[in-house]
């Protein structure tokens, strides 16, 4: 059940950050590789061209996952399935799990920083904010001056980060969802209430 899924692996390993990739262009094309990542990379090839394997590209070590997808819901499914088979008593659950769209411009140092801030604050679900010249759907996802954190009701699926227990507890509900519609506003808040993790925040870089 949800409670057991959330508590089955209390030990943690490094955070995991998945970045979407079209399988053809330069991996991490929008990511500024300006620091050593304090997390593990997953590259998800949504064209299905690449082989599932561990690679070292651009001096970055990454696990490649691959599958022809239509929408982000299938990426959630694929990551959840891979984690369910790769987590062992020796490897444990990632501390945090992030999923970034391939058009997000951000640096490795930024990702290190948001993970550090989330750890310090004990956040359960969070996201970096968008600059005001970004394309956006929700105005509340934009930067605000002189603020480091901002509580919100839910975090959009564009570049969310989840505590490992939250993601794993939600993963059975990803099944057969092509779209991720409703994951952000409904599924993850429901999961958090069920396992008593209730903190949503935006990190204002």
What are these regions (language model features)?
Residues 107-193:
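Conserved catalytic core of nucleotide-sugar-dependent glycosyltransferases
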Residues 92-105:
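Short beta-strand-to-loop acidic/aromatic patch adjacent to the donor-nucleotide binding site
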Residues 47-49, 129-134, 203-205:
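Short beta-alpha junction loops
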Residues 1-58:
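N-proximal low-complexity "stem/linker" segments adjacent to membrane-targeting elements
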């Amino acid at each position: 059940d949800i409670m057991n899924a959330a508590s089955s692996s209390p030990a943690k390993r490094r955070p995991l950050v998945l970045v979407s990739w079209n399988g053809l262009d330069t991996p991490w094309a929008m990511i500024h590789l300006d620091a050593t990542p304090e997390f593990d990379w997953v590259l998800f090839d949504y064209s299905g061209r690449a082989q599932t394997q561990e690679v070292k590209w651009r001096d970055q070590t990454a696990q490649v996952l691959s599958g022809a997808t239509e929408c982000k819901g299938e990426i959630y499914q694929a990551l959840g399935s891979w984690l369910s088979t790769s987590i062992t008593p020796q490897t444990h659950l990632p501390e945090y799990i992030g999923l970034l769209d391939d058009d997000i411009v951000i640096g490795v140092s930024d990702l290190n920083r948001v993970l550090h801030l989330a750890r310090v604050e004990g956040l359960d679900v969070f996201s970096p904010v968008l600059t005001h010249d970004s394309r956006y759907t929700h105005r509340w996802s934009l930067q605000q001056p002189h603020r480091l954190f901002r509580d919100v009701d839910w975090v959009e699926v564009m570049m969310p980060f989840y505590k490992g227990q939250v993601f794993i507890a939600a993963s059975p509900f990803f099944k057969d969802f092509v779209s991720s519609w409703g994951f952000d506003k409904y599924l993850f808040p429901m999961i958090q209430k069920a396992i008593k993790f209730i903190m949503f925040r935006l990190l204002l870089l």
